[in-house]
């Protein structure tokens, strides 16, 4: 089997800390662990992250932009998610996910999303519960400690880091536009990773 080409050089992935997991590992995430460091941190497999991003890009490109809902409760994900939504034209909810958003058509903020992109299954539990209830596919950024029940596509990544979240959402936006045919090559993607990163 040929090795899949990386979307960005391996050292760029490493610099962003995308592969730095947690000191606690769930059984669900076993297949995505590359190694355990001397300090007890689980390291995620960059090639599996890369592969998941390629699959997610193809999958999300099949949906109309307004059918995609990206959610984030984590503060470091606010900027990446809002920028991602702006670039790909999707809907987004940052901060508190109001109960009933996916299940109660009477709510003014009701969403008829056909697929949901979750930044952290642990933090975004309300969004997860509702997506499961209405039966829409779930793509989730999963760290070493996450449980992955009901997740249709796992993107193994550091879902807590400022830079790692920026890189993940930047790459995903670029993949979606390329798969849609909105850009013919990566050179045409003018946004930078910095555009997606929360500034402190």
From Swiss-Prot:
Keyword Ribonucleoprotein: yes
Keywords attached to this entry: Ribonucleoprotein, Ribosomal protein
One example GO MF annotation: structural constituent of ribosome
Pfam (any one): Ribosomal_S2
Keyword presence, Ribosomal protein: yes
Biological-process GO terms, alphabetical: translation
InterPro entries in alphabetical order: Ribosomal_uS2, Ribosomal_uS2_arc, Ribosomal_uS2_euk/arc, Ribosomal_uS2_flav_dom_sf
NCBIfam families named in the record: uS2_euk_arch
Similarity comment: Belongs to the universal ribosomal protein uS2 family.
The protein's name in its UniProt record: Small ribosomal subunit protein uS2
Upper taxonomic lineage: Archaea, Methanobacteriati, Thermoplasmatota, Thermoplasmata, Thermoplasmatales
């Amino acid at each position: 089997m040929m090795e899949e080409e990386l979307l960005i050089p391996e050292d760029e992935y490493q610099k962003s800390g995308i592969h730095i997991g947690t000191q606690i590992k769930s059984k669900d995430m076993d297949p995505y662990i590359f190694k355990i460091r001397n300090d007890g941190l689980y390291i995620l497999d960059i090639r599996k992250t890369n592969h998941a991003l390629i699959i997610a890009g193809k999958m999300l490109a099949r949906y109309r932009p307004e059918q995609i809902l990206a959610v984030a409760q984590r503060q470091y994900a606010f900027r990446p998610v809002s920028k991602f939504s702006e670039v790909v034209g999707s809907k987004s909810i940052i901060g508190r996910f109001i109960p009933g958003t996916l299940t109660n058509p009477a709510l003014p903020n009701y969403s008829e999303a056909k697929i949901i992109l979750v930044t952290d299954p642990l933090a975004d539990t309300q969004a997860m519960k509702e997506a499961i209830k209405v039966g829409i596919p779930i793509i989730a950024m999963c760290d070493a400690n996450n449980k992955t029940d009901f997740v249709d596509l796992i993107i193994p990544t550091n879902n807590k880091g400022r830079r790692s979240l920026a890189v993940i959402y930047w790459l995903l936006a670029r993949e979606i536009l390329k798969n849609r045919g909105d850009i013919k090559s990566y050179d045409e993607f003018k946004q930078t990773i910095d555009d997606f990163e929360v500034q402190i």
